[in-house]
Amino acid sequence: MTRCFLLLVDGLRPDVAERRLAAGDLPHISAMLKQGGRTTAITGFPSTTSVAYLPFLTGCTPGHCDIPSIRWLDRSTYTGRWWRDRKAVRSYCGYQAPMLDDDIRKDVQTIFELVPESVGIFTPVARGLSRERDPSRRERQVWGSLAHVSKWHQPSDDAVARHLLKAAEGSSRFVFAQFPAVDGFTHQSGADSAPVHRALARVDTTVGRLRQHLTSTGEVEDSLILIVSDHGASAVHTHLDLADWFRAQGVPTVAHPVVWERKPRAAVMVAGNGSAMVYARPGEPRNRRLPIERLRRAQTFGSGGDIVAALIREPSIAFVAAESEDGGILIESATGSARITERNGEICYHPLSGDPLLLGGPQSASARQWVEATWDAPYPDAPFHLLDQFRTPRSGDLLVIGKEGYDFRARYEIPEHRWGHGSLTRAHMQTPVWSSQPLPTAPLRTVDLFPGMLEWLGYPVPDGIDGEPVWLPRERRLGRASRRPTVVASAGQPTDEVTITT
């Protein structure tokens, strides 16, 4: 029987992970990698906790899942009555976190639904898990609240380790375990700080105990262990409170945690805190976004001028993006504009008056080619993720991307974030992938791990997911020639052999 253990170390930067490995501080992980492999992958956008877990656990991007961000507003139902409409102003950072499962599109299946013999530990995505298979749900709520206020993060990881080792003693085929301490310590102390090093060393000890148990039961060779992260991080030297910025322009603005505002003309939903979605005229229900041409009109926000032009002049803003009346996504920065379109199965980037994504000129490529072509770019894989952001009707009218070193919350960010994430910058989007099985040399997105895990477990891959089968660990282990697994519409039962099409 094959098993899969997906261990997510929240907020772990790949360069920090590699330095600790090279320094000899992670001996158990190092031993695992001698037979396995390690690489870097591009995460989902926005690069923030919970939302960026979706590619791992559904094989779909956040836009496909209909989850545009960790905070969002339902423009179709919000009428400006803050108490009656409070469910239309979503935040997975507080009491609404359990709503995430129901908010995911119904035709998107989690791995917990596809693999019934699953356990989730400290998971914000739990659809498909019974109470018995989500054993840490209460501890996650308690320790998560205490850690946020007290900066006491290690007890959460210790609880995760305890539940993980207990799950390993059972018969679960798939086990997901989220270790939150590295992210918590990164926000307050930095990505390469001593508290992060200590937390990562404790994860290494847990991996050693897990492998020791699997070796003692004769299961280690049939167990796939993946150590991943959902986002990176970068230092924050300046906080631009974006909601307060809109208020300073004379725009009544709704933003968490104060979500009541009389006759609001904007709603600012921050993620990470390096990006934000802005909804224009949120108290007027509608089903469609406003194009950027209308967002520029003074009467849209009631600011007395072109608020988009004023926004991109701010030093903290890398660029903004919105749909255009002429089609596609228009990107605006202080240095010029460009357009992203889809045509004949390719994503096209057309500089107009500038090159806001810093790609050096026009490019047209398939979605798979974009990840390789932009790997070392300032905003890797950005065209793919920008299109995905506007794939869901729940996303804002205007997407605001912060420059590295800046974020968009100040007054209500308690405790202060000295390091952050959530943007499209390389430091936020590139994440480590360590595996007990060899990994491909081709560039990966985190969403591509999903079909590989199902293939290892002998389950068919659902139709219509965004993850591509570029990594087939079971096939490689069995020494077969590289071929693609059959894609089917629903999960069904696991098979002894993965059906292959030639």
Predicted features along the sequence, with ranges:
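Active-site neighborhoods of enzymes that stabilize oxyanions during catalysis
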Residues: K263-P440, T446, F450, L478, ...
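Metal-dependent active-site segment of extracytoplasmic phospho-/sulfohydrolases and closely related
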Residues: L6, R202-F246, P252, I329-E332, ...
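Active-site metal-binding loops of divalent metal-dependent hydrolases
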Residues: D10-G11, S229-G232, E404
